[in-house]
From Swiss-Prot:
Enzyme Commission number, as recorded: 3.5.1.18
Keyword annotations of the record: Amino-acid biosynthesis, Cobalt, Diaminopimelate biosynthesis, Hydrolase, Lysine biosynthesis, Metal-binding, Zinc
Annotated catalytic residues: 75, 140
Descriptive protein name: Succinyl-diaminopimelate desuccinylase
Complex formation: Homodimer.
Associated pathway: Amino-acid biosynthesis; L-lysine biosynthesis via DAP pathway; LL-2,6-diaminopimelate from (S)-tetrahydrodipicolinate (succinylase route): step 3/3
Binding residues annotated for Zn(2+) 2, in chain numbering: 106, 141, 355
Length: 382
C-alpha cells in the first residue's frame, strides 16, 4: 500500500471524522451517531443508553450464539495548552505518516478500526456464526460512573452475556500488536485525614503534630512487601500521591494532615486484605485518623483461551510478530466487564503519546489494526 493510499482508507477517514469532534469527557459530540450509522448499515440493532449526562450505546448483530463485543469510548481528555500543539487538536492532520489529533491513539483510531473490521468481515461472512456487539461510552476518561459500568448492569438485568470482549485501549508499546493486555491490576485509593492538635512550634508539649504522627506509619507502608506478585502480575505497589498539611505559617504546628495514597494490586491480594493491613499499621503507630476508601476496580486476568489464542494468531498472521501478554499499566473499562465472566483483552495502537500534547498514531498502524480485528472475527465467528 502506498503512502497516499494508506491515508485514504476507510479506517483512516473514519478516524479523522471522529477526531474532528471535540468530545472532551463526558461529551460525545455526535461521535456515537457516526458510528451507529455505519453499524446500522451492516445490520446491527442499536439501543441508545443515556445515564445521567453520559451517552452510551449497545449494538448487536446476529440472533444467537456467543457474543464477541468490541468495547471502547468516544470521550477524550482535555487538550491542555493549545499553544503547545503543533496543529489544532480537533483538526486531524496527517504528517510524515502520523495522524495527529486528540484521541488519535486513545481511542478514536481503535473505534474506526473496529467499525471497518466489522464492515470487511460481514462483507465476507454475512451469515457468520455467533453475535457481534459494540459497547461504547462517553464516560471512560472521567468519573466512569454512568458509562460502561451502567451498561454492564443493564445487560445483566436482561441476562445478556458477553463471552469475548475486545477493548480498544492503546496497548502497544513500539509496534502495533507487540503487546496485548490480558489483565489489569486492581486499584484501591484512599483519602486519609490525620488528626492532631494545632499549637505553637515553641510549645510542642501543648500540640500534637499530625505530620510526626503519620510519618512512621507511611514509612512502614512504603517499605512493606505487600506481596511478591505472580507469573502474570508484578508485586503490589503502594504510592502516596498527595500530602498536605500546615497553615502556611512557619511557627504553627498544624492540626491536621491530609494524605492521598493508592494501591495497584495483583490477584494475590484482595481490597479487603489491603484495608485490614493498612488499618493494622496505622493502629500500631497510634495514629488518630479518618480513612475513606475508593475501590476503582478489582484485578482481572484472562488466561489462555479462545480470545487470547485468536488475538495471538491474528497478530502473527497480519504482522508476522509474536505478541507479549501483559497486565501492566493503569485501569480500563475492562474492569467492569471481566467480573461478568467474559474473557477480556485490550488490543490497540501504540500508547507513546496518549493524553499528551501532539497525540498521534501511525496511519499504517490503524490500517493494520483493522486487519487484526477482522482476522480475530474470522478466527472466532467465521
Amino acid at each position: 500500500m502506498t503512502n497516499e493510499s494508506a491515508h485514504n482508507t476507510p479506517t483512516v477517514k473514519l478516524a479523522c471524522d471522529l477526531i474532528a469532534q471535540p468530545s472532551v469527557t463526558p461529551e460525545d459530540a455526535h461521535c456515537q451517531r457516526m458510528m451507529i450509522e455505519r453499524l446500522e448499515a451492516i445490520g446491527f440493532k442499536v439501543e441508545n443508553l443515556r445515564f445521567g449526562d453520559v451517552d452510551n450505546f449497545w449494538a448487536i448483530r446476529g440472533e444467537s450464539g456467543p457474543i464477541l463485543a468490541f468495547a471502547g469510548h468516544t470521550d477524550v481528555v482535555p487538550t491542555g495548552d493549545l499553544g503547545k500543539w503543533a496543529t489544532d487538536p480537533f483538526t486531524p492532520t496527517i504528517k510524515d505518516g502520523m495522524l495527529y489529533g486528540r484521541g488519535a491513539a486513545d481511542m478514536k483510531g481503535s473505534l474506526a478500526a473496529m467499525i471497518t473490521a466489522c464492515e470487511s468481515f460481514i462483507a465476507a461472512h454475512p451469515n457468520h456464526t455467533g453475535r457481534i456487539a459494540f459497547l461504547i461510552t462517553s464516560d471512560e476518561e472521567g468519573p466512569a460512573i454512568n458509562g460502561t459500568v451502567k451498561v454492564v448492569e443493564w445487560l445483566e438485568a436482561r441476562n445478556e452475556k458477553i463471552k469475548w470482549c475486545l477493548v480498544g485501549e492503546p496497548s502497544s508499546t513500539t509496534l502495533v500488536g507487540d503487546v496485548i493486555k490480558n489483565g489489569r491490576r486492581g486499584s484501591l485509593g484512599a483519602e486519609l485525614i490525620v488528626k492532631g492538635v494545632q499549637g505553637h512550634v515553641a510549645y510542642p508539649h501543648l500540640a500534637v503534630n499530625p505530620i510526626h504522627m503519620i510519618a512512621p506509619a507511611l514509612a512502614e507502608m512504603a517499605s512493606e512487601t505487600w506481596d511478591n506478585g505472580n507469573e502474570f502480575f508484578p508485586p503490589t505497589s503502594f504510592q502516596v500521591s498527595n500530602f498536605n498539611s500546615g497553615t502556611g505559617a512557619t511557627n504553627v504546628v498544624p492540626g491536621e494532615a491530609n494524605v492521598v495514597f493508592n494501591f495497584r494490586f495483583s490477584t494475590e491480594l484482595t481490597a479487603d486484605i489491603l484495608k485490614q493491613r493498612t488499618h493494622a499499621i496505622l493502629d500500631k503507630h497510634n495514629v488518630n485518623y479518618d480513612l475513606k476508601w475508593n475501590l476503582s476496580g478489582e484485578p482481572f486476568l484472562t488466561a489462555e483461551g479462545e480470545l487470547v489464542a485468536a488475538s495471538v494468531a491474528a497478530i502473527k498472521k497480519i504482522t508476522g510478530r509474536d505478541t507479549e501478554l501483559s497486565t501492566a499499566g493503569g485501569t480500563s473499562d475492562g474492569r467492569f466487564i471481566a467480573p461478568t465472566g467474559a474473557q477480556v483483552l485490550e488490543l490497540g495502537p501504540v500508547n507513546a503519546t496518549i493524553h499528551q500534547i501532539n497525540e498521534c498514531v501511525s496511519v499504517d498502524d490503524l490500517n493494520t489494526l483493522s486487519d487484526i480485528y477482522c482476522t480475530m472475527l474470522t478466527e472466532l465467528l467465521a
